[in-house]
Regions:
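The substrate-binding groove and active-site-proximal loops of carbohydrate-active enzymes
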Residues: 42-46, 105-115, 173, 280-284
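A charged helix-plus-loop insertion that forms the helical arch/lid used to bind
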Residues: 85-98, 155-162
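Active-site loop segments of alpha/beta catalytic cores
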Residues: 117, 121-335
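Glycine/serine-rich loop-strand microenvironments at binding/catalytic pocket rims
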Residues: 82-85, 91-92, 266-272
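N-terminal basic, low-complexity leaders that serve as flexible interaction/assembly modules and, when applicable
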Residues: 1-88, 124, 128, 218, ...
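A short acidic, glycine/proline-enriched capping/turn motif at secondary-structure boundaries
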Residues: 73-76, 91-92, 100, 142-144
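A gly/proline- and charged-residue-enriched helix-loop-helix capping module
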Residues: 89-128
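Short, solvent-exposed coil/turn linker segments
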Residues: 40-41, 98-100, 261, 279
Length: 335
């Protein structure tokens, strides 16, 4: 386990926090766009040598404390029999979404066999980075994945799944359970392949009421995190005021989106480490302002139990020099 990450998870005082960035590998880098001229997104994530090259591009540029595998939260749809593709301007589109309660009965295939390329990618990454760099695996959360397969694509409200919860609660829970079971296998697979940290992205769980999150999602999060023996991070958007629910999930670290005041979060969560939470839009400012805002965030978070990150993924059009300024701000904070 990478030392700086381990110390942050343990709550030890640090001269600076470990730093990485959600969507760290990807579209804002010109070298990434060159690769994508030859490979589609799905081809790139399912070809380990290409996915490893993409993952390592920001590692070579910015020297982050963690590299997050280049993959997608929807990869686990395949073993459950869902097909999807990407549409320009739309994003992921599920080709056979849930249309009835019967569609929530999902026997699944062999995760390690069907997603063999994920394990090989992690093995390549652990061999490529130095011992002080954490290799981060990840997975989508059961609510977010269920939302995608019910709606068929991204949505502001994911009303199809929320309606299923109201009209056919047994089918709703059956779908959540199907994803929970496969996610347990998937994160165990990533851990066995050599991942140092696992982040669970249940990004849209904040659409639920606190009572529904507590009843339907929290027990399933706990099951997933109980299956993992390495450090874990949970992330969901729009959870300000309900951070205690994320802290109860069993994850070691609570990820914060940019709408949360980090000082308030530290007070509410006590000794629970946090991750985040610079607004990704701030990376469109001048590099000097990016540095200033990043270092202000580091100061507000305190000298222990903090992993520096954005409050969500870096935007595709973010200037590369501003991404560099974000990482430089962290590295220079220790000087």
């Amino acid at each position: 386990m990478a030392t700086r990450f381990a110390q942050a998870v343990d709550g030890a005082p640090l001269d600076r926090p470990p730093v990485w960035m959600m969507r760290q590998a990807g579209r804002y880098l010109p070298e990434y766009r060159e690769i994508r001229e030859e490979y589609s997104f799905l081809e790139a994530i399912s070809t380990p040598e290409i996915a490893a090259e993409i993952t390592l591009q920001p590692y070579e540029r910015f020297d982050p404390d963690g590299v997050v595998m280049y993959s997608d939260i929807l990869t686990v749809l395949e073993p459950l029999g869902f097909d999807y593709h990407l549409e320009s301007g739309v994003g992921p589109v599920v080709e056979n979404p849930v249309d009835s309660a019967a569609d929530t009965e999902r026997p699944h295939g062999d995760v390690r066999e069907e997603l063999w390329y994920v394990g090989e990618l992690i093995e390549r990454l652990t061999a490529a980075v130095d011992e002080s760099t954490a290799v981060l695996g990840f997975a989508g959360g059961p609510f977010t994945l269920s939302a995608y397969v019910c709606e068929g694509q991204s949505s502001r409200t994911f009303m199809s799944l929320r309606r299923l919860r109201a009209e056919q609660p047994a089918a709703f829970e059956r779908l959540l359970d199907a994803f929970t079971e496969i996610l347990i296998e998937y994160v165990e697979y990533q851990e066995d392949a050599g991942a140092d940290v696992i982040q669970l992205f249940d990004t849209y769980a904040g659409l639920l009421s606190p009572a529904d999150y507590r009843e339907f999602v929290l027990p399933r999060h706990r099951r997933i995190f109980e299956a993992i023996d390495i450090p874990t991070i949970v992330f969901a958007r729009n959870m300000a005021g309900n951070l205690d629910l994320l802290a109860d999930s069993g994850a070691d670290v609570v990820g914060l989106d940019w709408t949360v005041d980090i000082e308030t979060a530290r007070e509410e969560l006590g000794d629970t480490p946090v991750q985040g939470n610079l607004d990704p839009a701030l990376l469109y400012g001048e590099p000097s302002e990016v540095k200033a805002r990043t270092q202000k965030l580091i100061e507000a978070a305190g000298d222990h139990g903090h992993i520096l990150n954005l409050g969500h993924g870096v935007d595709r059009n973010t200037p590369v020099e501003n991404v560099a300024a974000f990482f430089e701000a962290a590295h220079e904070y220790a000087d």
